[in-house]
Each structure stands twice: as C-alpha cells, then as structure tokens.
C-alpha cells in the first residue's frame, strides 16, 4: 500500500527569525592610536561600503590585534550588505582559523544561505551553533542586563543556525535536502523547523532512492510538537497493519497540532486551516485504525470528524468513505437498523464513485447491501 500523505505537505513561506544586535566588544582600545581610531570609526559607521573599507584597512595593518575577530565580523556584515557573499565566506574562513567568533560565523552562515550553498551552510551552521552554545550552555545565570542580552542574542543566533539548514533544504535537490535535514536532526532533534520540512523530507528520501529510511526517520522525529512526523508514522504503521500504533500516533498528532503555537508571519485564518488539516488527517488515521480493530463505533465517529478537512485529498477521502460504509453497515446489521445500514450504503456508493483502489470493492459492497435492503 502506498503512502497517502502526499497531499499534506503544508509548507508556509519561511519566516526569518529575528536576531538582535551583535555581541559585545570583548577588548579595550585607545582611540588616540592609529588602530584605535579605525576601531572607533568602525564602531560608529553605518554605511556598508565605509565599513568594508575600514575593516579591510585594519586587518591589513593589524591582523594579529585582539580586536581582529570583531573587525572581521564588521567586515563580513558590510560585505553582506553589498551581497558579496563569496568575499564574506573568504573573510570568515581566515578569521575562524585565527579564533572562532560567533558573529563572524553567523554572518558567514547568512552568506551561505543567501547562496543556497549546501556544504557552506552545513559548515557554518555547525560553527555558528557551537559558538552560540558556549554562551547558552553556561550553568551560571546572567549576572546583569548586559549578560542577559548576550544570552538572548546567542539563543537567537543558535536558532538561526537551524533556520539556515531548513531554508536551504527546502530549495535543494532530494539528496542534498536529505543531507541537510539529517544534519538538522543531529544538531537539534526537537528543532522547531523539523515539522515544517518533515513531509518534504520524507518525499525527498523516496526520490533519493532511500525510501526505506522514511518510516524509521518518522518514528525518530515523532517527538514534541512534530505532528507531521507523527502522521507519517501513523501511515507507516497503517501500511504495516499495526492498528494500535496507528491509533497511538494519530492521537499524539492531534494533540500536537491542537496545542502548537502559531508561527510568526502566518495569518490567523491560514494557521487555523493548517491546524484543521492536521487534526482532520489525525482523525482519519484514528478512524482507519479503529476499523482495523473492528471497533466500528469509534471508527464511525473519527471518520465523520475527518471528512470535512480531508475532502481535498481524494485518496484519503475515498478510503474514509469506504470505512464509513463498513462501520455503519456493521453497526446497523446486528440491530436490524436499516436506517444505519442505508447510511453505510450511501458511503459505499460515494466511495464507488471515486477512482482509486477502493472503487471496485466499494461498488460490490454497495450492490450487496442494496440487495440486503430489498433493493431500496
């Protein structure tokens, strides 16, 4: 049985996470010296071209100065403003060799993301996250407002390190997308961006000839609020004829989708529609799971709840109609409840009218139930 989740790729436009001002200057300088004058001017300059000129001048004259890392970051920032992405990466690589700097790594990552460069994005995402986590991983609470600001800044930089992998993955070829998402999973298995890329990632695994890894990956990713991975895991277990797991994953997916916080940049209406689609699909898997167990009462309830939101997915809709036909027939027959049996007939007939794997059997079932009802 194939996966029926292809129609559930819910990808909103990526929303760039905000990042606060750069980290503080961890050095002291004398503004009366030639190098101090450049540093002072660089700290006050807002024009990208002037910042680039000042940064290049300083690094050419004072490459071993204790402020060289900070200056390199200012130079990278100016080059970013000029969209000189290759030069940003060149400066960053040289600066990194002389000592890791969080701002320098962050600006290099922004350049790599702007280029959609897979290898550079992976490299600088890892370096950016490592530098940020040296600050966020401290056991000591912030001593003052400045330390709190630095901590918040580091958290946002670390978040951007995940965002960079995510946004480049969305534009990558299947093998590269798989590589980038695998890197993101390793970097943070609970990343807020994994639900956004989950279905695209599972499809990319198949396109890359690694479809056999999709179900294990979904089970691994089905944590926290990742409703998309939970639904894929439910689908895997449905195809594997494991009803208990189908119902369990579906319930978790419904809970995750219902309680997920709204993303920035998404309208209330769009967010409500996306959540409804996820919950509706979760209801579908709950219903088919109960049908597998021949628990037709709960199946009937879940599948009816699913219908309005899965109508756009013809494959799921036809199966839901078929299982509703079966549930209502089986609920009505032992009681001699012809009204409920006719309800089952109606669902079988609707399913029979839809092209797909259920069509022939739905048509046969409809004829049998109709005959049992006396042809009317």
Description of each model-found segment:
Residues 61-69, 97-104, 133-144, 151-156, ...:
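Short solvent-exposed coil/turn linkers within tandem alpha-helical repeat scaffolds
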Residues 45, 82, 115-116, 171, ...:
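Structural motif corresponding to the intra-repeat A-B loop/turn of tetratricopeptide repeats
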Residues 18-74, 83-86, 90, 98, ...:
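N-terminal leader/linker segments that initiate helical-solenoid repeat arrays
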Residues 25-30, 277-282, 330, 335-376:
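Terminal, low-structured helical/coil segments at or just beyond the last alpha-helical repeat
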Residues 97, 113-137, 223, 238, ...:
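TPR/TPR-like (Sel1-like) alpha-helical repeat modules
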Residues 40, 74, 107, 163-167, ...:
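"A position-specific structural signal for the A-helix of alpha-solenoid helical repeats
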């Amino acid at each position: 049985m194939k996966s029926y989740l292809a129609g559930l790729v819910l990808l909103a436009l990526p929303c760039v996470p905000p990042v606060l001002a750069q980290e503080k200057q961890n050095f002291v300088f004398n503004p009366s010296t030639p190098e101090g004058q450049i540093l002072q001017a660089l700290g006050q300059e807002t024009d990208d071209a002037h910042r680039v000129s000042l940064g290049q001048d300083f690094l050419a004259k004072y490459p071993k100065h204790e402020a060289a890392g900070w200056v390199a970051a200012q130079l990278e920032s100016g080059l970013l403003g000029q969209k000189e992405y290759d030069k940003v990466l060149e400066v960053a690589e040289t600066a990194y060799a002389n000592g890791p700097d969080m701002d320098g790594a962050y600006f290099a990552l922004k350049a790599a993301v702007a280029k959609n460069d897979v290898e550079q994005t992976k490299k600088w995402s890892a370096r950016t996250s490592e530098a940020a986590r040296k600050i966020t991983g401290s056991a000591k609470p912030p001593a003052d407002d400045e330390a709190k600001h630095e901590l918040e800044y580091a958290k946002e930089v670390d978040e951007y390190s995940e965002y960079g992998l995510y946004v480049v993955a969305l534009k990558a070829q299947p093998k590269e997308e798989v590589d980038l998402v695998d890197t993101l999973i390793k970097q943070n298995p609970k990343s807020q961006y994994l639900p956004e890329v989950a279905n695209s990632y599972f499809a990319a695994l198949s396109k890359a000839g690694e479809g056999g890894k999709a179900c294990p990956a979904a089970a691994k990713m089905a944590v926290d609020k990742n409703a998309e991975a939970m639904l894929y895991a439910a689908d895997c277990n449905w195809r594997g004829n494991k009803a208990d797991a189908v119902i369990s994953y579906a319930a978790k997916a419904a809970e995750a989708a219902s309680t997920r916080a709204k993303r920035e940049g998404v309208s209330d209406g769009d967010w409500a529609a996306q959540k409804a689609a996820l919950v509706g699909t979760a209801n579908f898997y709950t219903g088919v799971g109960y049908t597998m167990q021949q628990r037709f009462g709960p199946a009937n309830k879940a599948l009816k709840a699913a219908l309005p939101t899965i109508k756009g997915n013809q494959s799921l809709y036809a199966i839901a109609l078929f299982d509703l036909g079966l549930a209502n027939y089986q609920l009505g027959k032992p009681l001699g409840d012809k009204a409920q049996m006719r309800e089952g007939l109606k669902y079988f007939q609707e399913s029979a009218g839809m092209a797909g794997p259920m069509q022939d059997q739905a048509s046969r079932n409809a004829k049998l139930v109709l005959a049992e009802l006396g042809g009317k």
